[in-house]
Amino acid sequence: MGLALCGAAAQAQEKPNFLIIQCDHLTQRVVGAYGQTQGCTLPIDEVASRGVIFSNAYVGCPLSQPSRAALWSGMMPHQTNVRSNSSEPVNTRLPENVPTLGSLFSESGYEAVHFGKTHDMGSLRGFKHKEPVAKPFTDPEFPVNNDSFLDVGTCEDAVAYLSNPPKEPFICIADFQNPHNICGFIGENAGVHTDRPISGPLPELPDNFDVEDWSNIPTPVQYICCSHRRMTQAAHWNEENYRHYIAAFQHYTKMVSKQVDSVLKALYSTPAGRNTIVVIMADHGDGMASHRMVTKHISFYDEMTNVPFIFAGPGIKQQKKPVDHLLTQPTLDLLPTLCDLAGIAVPAEKAGISLAPTLRGEKQKKSHPYVVSEWHSEYEYVTTPGRMVRGPRYKYTHYLEGNGEELYDMKKDPGERKNLAKDPKYSKILAEHRALLDDYITRSKDDYRSLKVDADPRCRNHTPGYPSHEGPGAREILKRK
């Protein structure tokens, strides 16, 4: 769908404008506002310093298409029936009668525009989308691919729009690919290899790089190296390879941060910027070498599920420190929060919670007792459904394959290194979190218990653990269904 850009000068307006900046793969673990010191996200950190950042923000699925389809519709993946990255008919497009963020705003007098990555299965309905034009370039140190080329076009389109905004209130999404280019970096450095030299020191490995006991984590997580092509390619990396991976991730993050800076400067170059609420977020995170993981796949560790969620602008009361006493779910909460701030009624069927009271500095009377993330499959080569329940202190995960479970004390063990699910001392807490999962399944009409596992035995035939990986991965040995 084409986008006719408005050329009228912005005027003062009662309703706030909204600029949503989303960066694919952006984990909290690289954002300065969340305590990181690499200096990768200075423009994002500046926005955060003026507003509110939520620490415990968890996505509905640590995979692009299910997460995005859920985000823009305010529904969970089992409700949208977009459960993987596959196209139709494996996944179905969101029905036309389902209210979306774009439809609610466009029907309320807003100009709703979207630039950049979609991967939405119809959930961006209501937004006018402009497809970015890829602008190739070269990089002296790190491989760049179409992800980075498309971001150049996305940035140019968003800057052009925000430099000359419409008269009516607008909601604009600048949807960047990076740091997703990290996936291409893995492909360029697959298997045992010698890394290209880079300028500057290599980053250190995270404290939770090593897995202490492969036998004490669920089967699907033990064998991600068989299920996910990028994990197959990285299975036999040495520690220096992983450090180069982190350096590359930081590099792609700095690239997109510069583009975020350009978009923000365009926004604030006109009077409309003073009346615009900025939201910065991500569809999911990245392993960042934690648990020897790269990119994201069958796991719910915080590096993959805990994302930046930042608000700043008119009516948003600056917080001196991150909001860490609330569990938030951008997947469900973004839609009602923005509708509340814009004075738009939220459909009764939407399960999210408006965070507007917290953003205004008021008491948050309604909050989540727990939040959930879901997993089904990436491209149906291996299907291993799972669920995560994150409570105020503990994180519980369950996988249908092997009835696998994890329980982590997120206060004592934020790196999720010691699985307590089999520890008798935690049997009561485990039972409580099993009950929370049952509550979610019942309340949200989740079909989780009826789903089927499909994992070829050839993807489970070596000693558990990525360094022990043997043979090709599922993508190479199985035909797509």
UniProtKB/Swiss-Prot annotation:
Keywords: Hydrolase, Metal-binding, Zinc. The modification 3-oxoalanine (Ser) is found at residue 64. Its cofactor is Zn(2+). One of its GO terms (molecular function) is metal ion binding. Zn(2+) binds at residues 225-226, 462, 469. Its EC number is 3.1.6.-. It is an enzyme of class 3 (hydrolase). Residues 453-481 are annotated as: Disordered. The conversion to 3-oxoalanine (also known as C-formylglycine, FGly), of a serine or cysteine residue in prokaryotes and of a cysteine residue in eukaryotes, is critical for catalytic activity. Residues 472-481 have a biased composition (Basic and acidic residues). Exosulfatase involved in the degradation of the glycosaminoglycans (GAGs) chondroitin sulfate (CS), dermatan sulfate (DS) and heparan sulfate (HS). 2-O-sulfatase active on unsaturated non-reducing end hexuronate units. Has a slight preference for HS-derived structures. GAG-specific sulfatases play a key role in the persistence of the major human gut symbiont B.thetaiotaomicron in the host gastrointestinal tract. Belongs to the sulfatase family. PANTHER family: ARYLSULFATASE K. This is Delta 4,5-hexuronate-2-O-sulfatase. It comes from Bacteroides thetaiotaomicron (strain ATCC 29148 / DSM 2079 / JCM 5827 / CCUG 10774 / NCTC 10582 / VPI-5482 / E50).
